Design a protein with these regions (language model features):
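Polar low-complexity intrinsically disordered regions
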Residues: 3-7, 11, 212-216, 223
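Membrane-interface junctions at the ends of membrane-embedded or membrane-associated helices
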Residues: 75-76, 148-161, 203-222
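Transmembrane alpha-helical segments
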Residues: 222-239
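Residues within membrane-spanning alpha-helices of integral membrane proteins
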Residues: 3, 164, 168, 199-202, ...
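Hydrophobic alpha-helical segments
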Residues: 179, 197-204, 209, 213, ...
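Alpha-helical transmembrane segments of multi-pass membrane proteins
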Residues: 141-145, 193-204
Length: 239
């Protein structure tokens, strides 16, 4: 019954005349070209907006999630292909996100990934015919897809794994769907909160599985969280 009420409310919110009037006003105020975009352009913008902020920028909550998945996979598997899958997201996020500024100063060509997102998306009408321009978007998709695979590997074929996957994908979708709204650049911070809360929940789920893992994996994750906490505190106080 509760689900039915939610669905009915969503249908009403989408179809009521006030929604169309508000969308027209927001398009004029925030995204004048929004009405000229197609489904695929909006989907690409939403995905790029949701993931660029956590992969190509210094978002420690998502980095800790990737690190937890790394420890979770490496504590359970010795097969090299599984370990490579566990290593891929945390490496990408560490190099392109956590170390974005110092690394791009050392290797300027990496700024192609970090600065790939524009206000029209990663792939625009102007750059659509350049295969190189698709690389930042494809890397974002690959990182998130491998995170889902790592989550399944770390938690196993369990109900908890499916629940954690739904929470993570739901948090991601709550921000990616803004690609279909003219306020995509004004409402991003609010919806990012739900995505990051989903990341924290999934991190806790993976942490529980490390209780049976060798002690070095738990200590490694604790040390990493401590370093991230100190780093965040220092940045907040301007040290």
């Amino acid at each position: 019954a509760h689900l039915g009420v939610c669905v009915a409310n969503a249908i009403y919110a989408i179809t009521c005349p006030g929604t169309a009037a508000r969308a027209a006003g927001e398009t004029t105020s925030w995204f004048i070209d929004f009405g000229m975009r197609n489904f695929f352009q909006n989907a690409e913008l939403g995905i790029s907006n949701a993931l660029s902020g956590v992969v190509y920028h210094r978002e420690l909550v998502f980095f800790v999630l990737c690190a937890a998945l790394f420890f979770g996979v490496w504590s359970k598997y010795r097969t090299w292909i599984y370990r490579l899958l566990g290593l891929f997201p945390v490496t990408c996020v560490f190099l392109l996100g956590v170390l974005d500024q110092p690394l791009t100063q050392m290797i300027p060509k990496l700024s192609f990934f970090v600065n790939g997102l524009t206000d029209k998306g990663t792939v625009t009408v102007v750059t659509a015919w350049s295969l190189k321009r698709y690389l930042p978007f494809l890397l974002l998709c690959a990182v998130f897809a491998v995170c889902i695979i790592d989550l399944y590997l770390a938690l196993g074929h369990t109900v908890q794994a499916w629940m954690a996957g739904v929470v993570l994908c739901g948090g991601f979708a709550s921000r990616a769907m803004l690609g279909f709204s003219p306020t995509v650049w004004q409402s991003g911070d609010r919806t990012a909160f739900f995505f990051l809360m989903g990341c924290l929940f999934v991190t806790l789920c993976v942490w529980q599985t490390l209780s049976d893992a060798p002690k070095r994996f738990r200590l490694g994750l604790i040390a990493l969280v401590g370093v991230c906490a100190v780093s965040t505190t220092l940045s907040l106080i301007g040290a």
